[in-house]
Amino acid sequence: MLMKPLAASTAMLLALAANAQAEELTLCWAAWDPANALVELSKDFEAKSGHTMKFEFVPWPNFADRMLNELNSGGKLCDLMIGDSQWIGGAAENGHYVKLNDFFDANGISMDAFVPATVTGYSEWPKNTPNYWSLPAFGDVVGWTYRKDWFERPEIAAAFKEKYGRDLVAPATFAELKDIAEFFQGREIDGKVVYGASIYTERGSEGITMGVMDVLYSFGFKYDNPDKPYDMQGFVNSPGAVAGLEFYKALYDCCTAPGASNTYMGEGIDAYKSGQVALQMNFAFTWPGFEVDPNVGGGKTGYLVNPAGPNGERFAQLGGQGISVVSYSEKKDAALEYIKWFATPEVQANWWKAGGFSCLRAVVEDPGFASSQPYAQTFLDSMAIVKDFWAEPSYATLLQDTQKRFHDYVVAGNGTAQEALDGLVKDWTTNFEDEGKL
């Protein structure tokens, strides 16, 4: 266990806190299954601390707008915020979150105790510096599910092998994934026409950006020059990045269901559970629900790390969030008690059991973790290859530009991939020039 010893047991500290003024804390997050699990988990905190927890959960398509507006207005609705990874730069630089370094030091909470990618992704600003604004709360990453039961049907497996000359197994490359999607597109299974894949195409929030980036990374896309920050020409619009964007459009055109022009997490879940698609791109948070679903659970679903690109590179889009104390809260001490409780190994182990994706190394590096769920090893392997979108203070503008460029090309069919990425370089350059970074 990498957590530093606490001066006294968590139970004792929380009991002492209960003798102080009991507070009603509001935790803000997205409305999804992990949030419901956290409500149940938090009953332990209420019992031990004497504080009462309230929750404000907002559907994902509206989550960023609603909560960023709350932060930017200095609102006091939220005492605790589980905010998206890309918000960290703006929240830190604009004073929305409480810096947690002193609190961590005083309470024996070491960032070395957490998966490094989640510390960088959820907690640090500036990136790769020991300045912490959140505790890693929910690890998440884009991966794939596939209908393992369909793959194993002898007649389907034989038809695939006859056409492609290889066995129908989980794809190791994106080229293989596209072959499988094309094979299933329009095929009749159990009297129902099915389709190849569900991928992210949503325009209004972040959907198509998360999906396209998940593929582009493995084709060689880079946000900027590793040796010269914000130097994007030839990195964002490299030949590999262009090929990746062309691939994504080809996958959309060949192998998605009719009407899949505005698909994100919820639509992907519905398409997969209803037996509409053979392959589905989605964040790992969906996997516990699939595993217990009567239609696709109980061994019918396989879990897949993002496949490799044409040169063997393999990366995946980071999801997930850290938990922060909102600087405008009048109940910061009680909010910090919650973070202290949440950071303990016992609570983190229970978080995983409840359906949360713990970022604590003592949990995920436990010898029994990989076999604890059918998707656990895929989660570990995926978290080892993550990359993330910009986390700059101007994240929202950068994202809006990206959403438009990608949707216009992939879904609307306007222009070429080269033109879309050249335009994105222009958009992002203007943004960073306005910020004085170029």
Give the ranges of each region predicted by the language model.
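Conserved C-terminal helix/tail region of periplasmic/extracytoplasmic solute-binding proteins
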Residues: E24, A47, T52, D381-L438
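Extracytoplasmic "Venus flytrap"
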Residues: L25-E40, V58-P61, D140-V141, E206, ...
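Mature extracytoplasmic/periplasmic domains
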Residues: D44, G268-I269, F285-D293, G309, ...
